Amino acid sequence: PQPAAVVDFSSAYPAATRALRGLALVQDRRAALVQDELVLPKPVEITWAMTTDADVRTDGASAVLRLQGKQLHARILAPAGATFEVESGEQKSPQKRNAGVRRLLCRLTNAQGNVRIAVLLTPAWPDGPPKTAPAITPLEKW
């Protein structure tokens, strides 16, 4: 079995009747899978995001993050057709400014019903990335 954890964060999302996040080490612990599952009774906009100091380049459902000579590849595995975008992570006072910080986003507009967002994060390994993506299974089966 793969090392994994699932957290119920429904109380943080009033628009969802259920909201779960799973994190698993996959592909012989060479990658991390972040998977969110939400039950949304009405259409809403959902944004999956990660904040980083890295330089970020996107290409549809893929992104490469570079920092201090290291690379991390991000790929949206679900839903089909979803794409990444990048925005500034800088904030206004009185918050910490976060100069140079970026946010890698996957935004779903009019999301409704059973919604799954799955993002695979893979460091750049010397022997290259894994050849295939892991199978996406419901969090209840983790």
Describe each region flagged by the PLM.
Residues P1-W142:
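CBM-like, beta-strand-rich accessory domains located in the C-terminal region of large
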